Amino acid sequence: MATLIYRRTMQVHMDKLDEAMRITTEQAKIFKELTGKDELVSFQVGGNPRTICRQRMVEMDKLGEDDSKVSADPKWQELEKQHKGVFVDGTMVDEMRYVINMPE
């Protein structure tokens, strides 16, 4: 079974990093509650510290299942609305990376 690292990075408006961290860590908790899987939240050290990255491991054959669960959740939807004014529009970058050394 193929494993992917799914990563989403977004830029944060000046003076909004604390709010961005609050929103994304709440979303990570909801993701864990609904899927039983971890989502890691980080920000960059050095370079541009005003970016937030959410990262999770997913099985390729179940790629859309987790997203369907969380996107239907009312708490998740409310947090998505809070992105406006916190995250910079048009800066979202999604990346999927195939894991080549997944432990068995």
Q: Where would I find each of the regions flagged by the language model?
A:
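Short, low-order "capping/linker" segments at domain edges
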Residues: 92-104
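Short acidic/glycine-enriched loop/turn segments that link adjacent beta-strands
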Residues: 47-51
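Short, surface-exposed ligand-recognition loops at beta-strand->loop->(often short) alpha-helix junctions
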Residues: 11-22
